[in-house]
């Protein structure tokens, strides 16, 4: 399963670790992803999404029905 938020599209990004001597070594910054079940009142069922913490805030703000419609419009499965 890829490390991508199904709502926001956040994915891992790369950067550097910096030691005290300012030596740079490559590292990855991973999104804060969680598998979360959401109740969809219109479909009378739970939907499991892999979402970031920000994705959960977006769902709280817009509503799960609207977010699922956007995911469907992009052609993704959930």
UniProtKB/Swiss-Prot annotation:
GO cellular component terms listed in the entry, alphabetical order: ribonucleoprotein complex; ribosome
Listed A to Z, the keywords are: Ribonucleoprotein, Ribosomal protein
Q: Which domain of life is it from?
A: Bacteria
Q: Which Pfam families match?
A: Ribosomal_L28
Q: Which residue ranges are recorded for the region named Disordered?
A: 1-22
| Record-linked InterPro entries | Bacterial_rp_bL28, Ribosomal_bL28, Ribosomal_bL28/bL31-like_sf, Ribosomal_bL28_bact-type, Ribosomal_bL28_sf
Coiled-coil stretches are none
Gene Ontology molecular function terms on file: structural constituent of ribosome
A GO BP entry: translation
UniProt lists the family membership as follows:
Belongs to the bacterial ribosomal protein bL28 family.
PANTHER family named among the record's database cross-references = 50S RIBOSOMAL PROTEIN L28, LARGE RIBOSOMAL SUBUNIT PROTEIN BL28A
Q: Which NCBIfam families match?
A: L28
What's the protein name?
Large ribosomal subunit protein bL28
The lineage is:
Bacteria, Pseudomonadati, Pseudomonadota, Gammaproteobacteria, Enterobacterales
